[in-house]
Amino acid sequence: MKKIALLLYTVIVLVLAASCDRRAEYLTASGAMLGTTFQATGDITDCTAQELYRAIMQIDAEAKASMSIFDSTSLLSRINRGETDSLDEHIIYNLRLAERFSRLSEGHYDVTVKPLVDAWGFAGHEAERTPNLDSLLQFVGYRRVHIRDGRLVKDDPRVQLDFNSIAKGYTVDLVAALMERCGAK
């Protein structure tokens, strides 16, 4: 009986010791994304570094095609020009989140600021000498846009959206979810 107990004890100790000795093998994917650089590192078990990198680049491409104000062919650029009112899941999610932040901040956070961003020379536009803010503010206000049946309804067609303040964080969330699907711990 003592031999069985000793053998069982030895097996348990060896199993525990072997499991404690596991060394994490971290994978890293890095590159350029959304106008900046990224490095994603994790103890990933279900994807290779190359698969992780490709999937991150796909997320980047989808985010740019949807929400970029720097790409004239993006869905958001086409919406801002009044060429479409169709929305994709990225814009719907971010617009709903932005509306929530706008309500919580009593309108101090607002993604309809694109006319002001342009007038002040941000986002690659040349600044107006002295922007006429009163004329621009009539097109700014989070309550001026609504989602109805997957479409954007603007109170005025000159209202424009700019998700630059929220899109990078959203994209990082997508990458984090990807890493979890790849087995990141």
Residue ranges of model-derived segments:
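Short, conserved phosphate/pyrophosphate- and ester-handling motifs at nucleotide-, phospho-/glycolipid
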Residues: K168
